[in-house]
Curated annotation (Swiss-Prot):
Gene3D superfamilies: 3.40.50.11480, ATP-grasp fold, B domain. Its cofactor is Mg(2+); K(+). This is Tubulin--tyrosine ligase. SUPFAM superfamilies: Glutathione synthetase ATP-binding domain-like. One of its GO terms (cellular component) is cytosol. It is an enzyme of class 6 (ligase). GO terms for biological process: microtubule cytoskeleton organization; protein modification process. Residues 3-370 form the TTL domain. Keywords: ATP-binding, Ligase, Magnesium, Nucleotide-binding, Potassium.
Length: 377
């Protein structure tokens, strides 16, 4: 009999994983403060990593990688992409981005040097001079010059400003209490018809204890309810696809897709009929490349292969597609929720791939092979 503890009562994903484990008959749930467990389903920001793996005779597994915030906080992701040897030269799939600290945080400003970007060795270097240099260059050359400011730890569409005015963007950040990212806004996104609407794509990615990377075969488009236009950046319902914003502010929420969600099968049908292309060849190949590039760049820093405990983690990668069918990484979520209809299959995949590979069920050899819900990258 294997044992597990649950330290995060708010995760719907791990509530389902917990239910599935108990249903096998091979797992027993212990009190949350019991140190002698095989598996911890913990809180992402409060995990006692230093105390894991020290119980004699027990292999211990935890559902997060220590250090994964390098990918999952917006400012850290920008720094990773600019400083990682694997990404700095070859990354063409991440929008131009700058890390900006509010002036009240007393952060040193990195001076622009002929447009050449110095490495971000300091963890607290403000890049506003580089942003302004790029902004002014684009303005002189008549390029699209719309940017989006986002709180590094923000979620659900909070702490966001879209503007073509550099002063407005910097003033907005300077009145906040935390680091932000200013990122080039994708002004020409691929739009869904009918409705001329924006969307983003959520893909779920599972990394097991050996740092094998698995992409969940299903994904979801989060769609806007209102037509996309560039003449009013304050109209969040046409620019931001977050469910909470669409549900709260758009009278057309749910008009085109139930819950403003389109799944991959429907999206593939749309691409085939509207553009004569397939999801796999036009978009998923790019998504797989981006996911693998990001995760391989952090593997040396976060892998648990030589530690006394093991980790796995579910990530949510968010993408946008422009009108040229180029895929752009927007952000990575380290504790993603899941579309309601996908919970059972996604969570069963977590049990089968990430947990049973470390703690195999006693009857593993008699169990029939399961259909591939995750694709190994």
């Amino acid at each position: 009999m294997y044992t597990f503890v649950v330290r995060d009562e708010n995760s719907s994903v791990y509530a389902e994983v917990s239910r599935l484990l108990l249903a096998t008959g091979h797992w027993k749930r212990l009190r949350r403060d019991n140190p002698r467990f095989n598996l911890m389903l913990g809180e992402r920001n409060r995990l006692p990593f230093g105390r894991l793996g020290h119980e004699p005779g027990l292999m211990q597994l935890v559902n997060y990688y220590r250090g994964a915030d390098k990918l999952c906080r917006k400012a850290s992701l920008v720094k990773l992409i600019k400083t990682s040897p694997e990404l700095a030269e070859s990354c063409t799939w991440f929008p131009e981005s700058y890390v900006i600290y509010p002036t009240n945080l007393k952060t040193p400003v990195a001076p622009a040097q002929d447009g050449i970007h110095p490495p971000l060795h300091s963890s607290r270097t403000d890049e506003r001079e580089f942003f302004l240099a790029s902004y002014n260059r684009k303005k002189e050359e008549g390029e699209g010059n719309v940017w989006i400011a986002k709180s590094s730890a923000g979620a659900k569409g909070e702490g966001i400003l879209i503007s073509s005015d550099a002063t407005e963007l910097l003033d907005f950040i300077d009145n906040q209490g935390q680091v932000h990212v200013i990122q080039k806004y994708l002004e020409r996104p691929l739009l869904l018809e009918p409705g001329h609407r924006k969307f983003d794509i959520r893909s779920w990615v599972l990394v097991d204890h050996q740092f094998n990377i698995y992409l969940y075969r299903e994904g979801v488009l989060r769609t806007a309810s209102e037509p996309y236009h560039m003449d009013n950046f304050q109209d969040k319902t046409c620019h931001l696809t977050n469910h909470c914003i669409q549900k709260e502010y758009s009278k057309n929420y749910g008009k085109y897709e139930e819950g403003n969600e389109m799944f991959f099968e429907a999206f593939n049908r749309y691409l085939t009929s509207a553009l004569n292309i397939t999801l796999e060849s036009s978009i998923l190949l790019q998504i797989k490349h981006i996911i693998r590039s990001c995760l391989m760049s952090v593997e040396p820093a976060i892998s648990t292969k030589h530690l006394p405990y093991q980790s796995f983690q579910l990530f949510g990668f968010d993408f946008m597609v422009d009108e040229e069918l180029k895929v752009w990484l927007i952000e990575v979520n380290g504790a993603p929720a899941c579309a309601q209809k996908l919970y059972a299959e996604l969570c069963q995949g977590i049990v089968d791939i990430a947990i049973a590979s470390v703690f195999p069920p006693p009857d593993a050899e008699q169990q029939p092979p399961q259909p591939a819900t995750f694709i190994k990258l």
